[in-house]
Amino acid sequence: MNPKGRTNLNRSIIGGHDHGSILQLLLFLLLLSSHGGFKFVAGQATHGGSDVSGDSSRFDPTMAILMIVLVSVFFFLGFFSVYIRRCLERVMGMDYGNPNDAGNWLATNRQQARGLDASIIETFPTFQYSTVKTLRIGKEALECSVCLNEFEDDETLRLIPKCCHVFHPGCIDAWLRSHTTCPLCRADLIPVPGESIVSIQIPGLVNDPPGSDPNGDRIRSLGSPDARLIESVALTCNQSMPRRSMSTGWNLAGMFTNSDRTGQHSENLDRFTLRLPQDIHNKLVNPNLSKVHVALPQVMSSTRGYRTGSLGSERNYFYYERFDQDGRLDRRPFSITPPYRTSSINHMSPGGSGGDKVRASSPKSLLLAMRSPFDRLFLGKNNNVGENSSDHLRSCDATPSNTV
């Protein structure tokens, strides 16, 4: 606190005392005058009473003391309210030497709660809905989550690059002027110097290649080099197939659910999210934002689907299992330490076709894929989908192994 501000504070307190003394004096005179008028009226009403006896009988000192006490209480209440307000303003760090800043701590809080600058808001791309209507992925109608109105072909949309949510410019601009997050998913929209935004497209949900099976399995993978773990979560349409997963102690599978990039259920946000092919998305965003957009590699196949994404690791090897559309197992080991090699053990299918192979690095690794009791319970004994039993070990031992 500067000396000037302290001087003004002292002046206000001293001035308060002066005004209080004058107020007390005025109230005391008013009390005396009212008491004299009351005596005059009462003397006229008695008609013949003695003036001395009337004055002594009608003067009530208790009432006068009570009035003075009440006035003093009101004065001290006003004084302490002003004093407490001054102390609060001092805590807020205001400069009371400047009379224009007095009482502006609420305005300071409003400034701290401001949203994005207009220059940042203008960096979010805008376009007409008719230009992307035929290119968007998904058949559900697209709506603005602020006004809940469906977009028309001639309306202008504003895209939030971080979450791909779209709004009317009038709706979202009013929000962003007082907030710094997306109103739908609460994504932080404040740009950080040197930050590069990564726009992640979930494989299978965007950029589906021509000829791919729309009912095929879609998979998202997370690699953990520290724990040498790759855990995959299969988004299968056939929920009757049991899932198996093996991990090194991290329950990473629970981190990924059937949701989109915002962390909320996709069925609730599809009508507010504009999903475009990656190249079109980059064309919309890159002219206004000098940031990097990266897409995850597409893990799909028109002939084979991934039934499960469970993985195990043994002796610096990664194993993954996948099943083609006929339910035949394809198990591939890959070494993560040089030299990188894979080994295979050919096993002829009962039908005699040479195209079905079971690949593994050693007989021990096949034990990791042995059929669990849940597979026996749900799939039955005659179903060969996902079957890796000890019977295969005997047939595999009879076939020589080839090292690539």
Curated annotation (Swiss-Prot):
Annotated Gene3D superfamilies: Zinc/RING finger domain, C3HC4 (zinc finger)
Pathway(s): Protein modification; protein ubiquitination
Assigned keywords, A-Z: Membrane, Metal-binding, Signal, Transferase, Transmembrane, Transmembrane helix, Ubl conjugation pathway, Zinc, Zinc-finger
Start and end residues of each stretch annotated as Disordered: 339-361, 385-404
Bilayer disposition of the protein: Single-pass membrane protein
Molecular functions per Gene Ontology: transferase activity; zinc ion binding
Signal peptide: 1-36
Segments crossing the lipid bilayer: 64-84
Catalytic activity field: S-ubiquitinyl-[E2 ubiquitin-conjugating enzyme]-L-cysteine + [acceptor protein]-L-lysine = [E2 ubiquitin-conjugating enzyme]-L-cysteine + N(6)-ubiquitinyl-[acceptor protein]-L-lysine
Alphabetized CDD domains for the sequence: RING-H2_EL5-like
Enzyme class: transferase
CC annotations in GO: membrane
Enzyme Commission no: 2.3.2.27
Zn finger residue spans: RING-type: 144-186
Principal subcellular localization: membrane
Subcellular location: Membrane
GO terms (BP aspect): protein ubiquitination
Similarity comment: family membership: Belongs to the RING-type zinc finger family. ATL subfamily.
PANTHER family per record: RING FINGER DOMAIN-CONTAINING (PTHR14155), RING-H2 FINGER PROTEIN ATL11 (PTHR14155:SF590)
Domain notes: The RING-type zinc finger domain mediates binding to an E2 ubiquitin-conjugating enzyme.
Protein's recorded name: RING-H2 finger protein ATL11
Organism lineage: Eukaryota, Viridiplantae, Streptophyta, Embryophyta, Tracheophyta
